[in-house]
Amino acid sequence: MQFWKVHGARNDFVLVDETEEEVVPESDKPDFARWACDRRSGVGADGVVFIRSDPPSVEMRIFNRDGSEAEFCGNAARCVVKYVTEVRGENVKILRTLSGAHRVEVQGGWIAVEVPEAEIKKVVELGYEVDAGVPHFVRLTERDPIHDFGGLTDEAKTIFSEYEPKGGVNVTYAAPSVDELRVRTFERGVGWTPACGSGVVAASLVYSEIFGPFEEVSVRTAGGCLRVSLSDGPLLIGRAEIVYKGELRGDWRENTDHQRRRHSLSRSPSGRPRLQECR
């Protein structure tokens, strides 16, 4: 079984191409995601992405580390476009997810993904409820959420627990500065990640609502810089990287109890792992 390791702003994923055939049976996908995302006994990732390409569109499904399925993921979306464009050699114009259809554009090394349904739904006492393909609770903070996020964990878990009866929520902290927004998200089904694409969009909407309006917002995350165009879309703009191609040996189901799992990378003639160069 082949897979690809990819990341967008260090939000990393195991990508499985099911265009030709179903690689992982539907009933096994949650268990596979839990195993594959384990950084000690699996491959290691924040999520698993399954795709089916049908140019000019591609279908994407994203499963979180805990096995739950998410409606949308902005960073995974860019990774899918990168893979289909560079590995499959196909043009992508529409990305289909559980949250709906998203227009995509490739602009040199940058990939733009439209999040047409993004909007502020409700202002509450501690922050803002935002739909950015998935639900977010955006909270402005004076604390730097990139480096000083540990002190926010208890509050993030408390907010999450309040929304758990409704399916949970992604808790996004945003700290405005002079020329950029600094953002970090406690993701539903994952926890803290270096970057959350939908969280970046959600925070940008709130930032523009309070301090704007702005046509574009520059956002810094622990995984790098992203841009959100609010004049058309909105559009989440950033890069994506293909790290390596891997192959699973044996049956992963035998190791869903989190025992050590063997997997191999594509090897160069020297015997070292071959890392695909990102352009």
UniProtKB/Swiss-Prot annotation:
GO terms (BP aspect): lysine biosynthetic process via diaminopimelate
Main location: cytoplasm
SUPFAM superfamilies (alphabetical): Diaminopimelate epimerase-like
Location of the region described as Disordered in the Swiss-Prot/TrEMBL record: 255-279
CC terms in the record's Gene Ontology section: cytosol
EC number: 5.1.1.7
Reactions mediated catalytically: (2S,6S)-2,6-diaminopimelate = meso-2,6-diaminopimelate
Protein family (similarity comment): Belongs to the diaminopimelate epimerase family.
NCBIfam families listed in its UniProt record: DapF
HAMAP family: DAP_epimerase
Protein name: Diaminopimelate epimerase
Gene: dapF
